[in-house]
Structure formats: structure tokens, C-alpha cells
């Protein structure tokens, strides 16, 4: 199981939203078909066919819990997987 698989599993399990590393999510999102745009500390992910923007900012090397929930909601709603 790769690191991306483990990160995706953590996100989808909804048990560790406050404990997911920012760098792991940043490397996972392009593998899921998202495109990255950086504006200051904001890492903005878009994907063709999805109107929702995913805007992430690091806090002490981790993702904010509400942003992890946003990622999970988008992945489930649009049936996105590795």
C-alpha cells in the first residue's frame, strides 16, 4: 500500500481529520486528477468537470479538519478514487 493509498484511506475513514499531513494531501491530489494553483499560502485544487474549488492552507504541517472534510465530500460526491 503506497503513501497515497494510506492518505486517501485516512481521509475517507473520517477518523483522523485533524491529523493528516499537509504534504501528503498535496502529493495525493494530483494523483486524483486535480490541478494545483498556489497563491501565497493557499494551495487551490481544481478538476475539470467539478465546479468546487478545494483551497488548502497548512497549519503546523497539517491540514485543517474542515478542509479534510471538504476533500472527503468532493471525493464521495463525484466518486473519485485512485
Positions of predicted regions on the chain:
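A charge-rich, low-complexity, intrinsically flexible signal that marks solvent-exposed coils, linkers
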Residues: 3-6, 10-27, 31, 36, ...
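Solvent-exposed, flexible loop/coil residues
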Residues: 24, 49, 58-60
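Generic structural "secondary-structure junction" signal
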Residues: 13-14, 56-58
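C-terminal structural segments of small proteins and small subunits
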Residues: 59-82
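A short, structured beta-strand/loop element
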Residues: 28-54
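Short, composition-biased local secondary-structure segments
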Residues: 1-3, 70
